[in-house]
């Protein structure tokens, strides 16, 4: 049977029930008058209208008198021109670069973009800043990324400094058993590069040539700046022995200056006989002595271990830095001649850094990387020609000697290859640099173009013009 049709009485009763429920929720009374509900609705609507009117009024006032975007920003940049300005008290000064702006403001804040028209209504002061200071302050390399290399290409044709890990697979790292013969120019001393060091060798001395197997070897020509980056070892030459040819007191039956050997389970050991005992030496030192004076012996005499055991062990001759065995010359692989020699320097804690040599066909830059050619480049001259530091990065370093003793002046090196001295800790903080600087070799840093010192006093110098460069 169909339900009866809804009448107006049903609808009226339903509406009445809804009003009672609404009053109960709003006023806690099911019997509240409908006027109270009507008044609440009216006040809500009126409040919304007033809020809209107030918001429109604020927007109108902001349009007529906008609030300056300068606010309390210490450094701003004009949107239209990109010019930088720094606030000093209530005066805005144009500033030459971001490094100077941060030093003047004593903060590492970034510039806030503003309209040039806003700056037109402010107090303006003269130009401030350090000419030539970094315009951008890039992220410094981390300790694991900090490695230094100075390379010489084309027999002294150009020199390049590479900052960062060596990534060129064509470069061969010389092992401790390899060496390369170099000289800076015709007539200058010849050096043997081996084991992370350099030593002078006299190619006119037959004993040296034969002991190191340098017959027919022609030195590679390299820049002096590359040699300066290598720790120097004592000259490799036959040592002078006091009382040579006389009978030894320390080892009876043998002459002073003679070389003997004993056979161990691990191989042969060489000893030189001295007045008061014997000194252990390497194969190179043994050959140097024998090519100088073999004392008529065709072969190195072999003695029983118990014979030499009774002799005092001394350490008189300065031959400990000599290579133990004749190093193997590096001439490059077949079809790939050595055109570039590099000295690499990697910081190590504690003590001296690790120095190694690379030989290859070019500087060890990443694939696609191109070194920056410096304005001071002079080809075969003494100046550095190019620098590679990953674009958009910098290096915050402390100069260290090759011996590893202490740290000196701190520098910020930019990706354009210029080094800037850091005056103090406050300067480093204002520039946003890390707390600790990473060690770097001073002989390599010294080859980089030197920029002005970064200090708050230098940055605060007012100037009307900037003198043109040379």
Swiss-Prot record:
GO terms for molecular function: ATP binding; hydrolase activity. InterPro entries: T7SS_EccB (IPR007795), T7SS_EccB_R1 (IPR044857), T7SS_EccB_R3 (IPR042485). It is a single-pass membrane protein. One of its GO terms (cellular component) is extracellular region. The keyword Hydrolase applies. The chain crosses the membrane at residues 44-64. An ATPase. Part of the ESX-4 / type VII secretion system (T7SS), which is composed of cytosolic and membrane components. NCBIfam families: T7SS_EccB. This is ESX-4 secretion system ATPase EccB4. It comes from Mycobacterium tuberculosis (strain CDC 1551 / Oshkosh). The gene is eccB4.
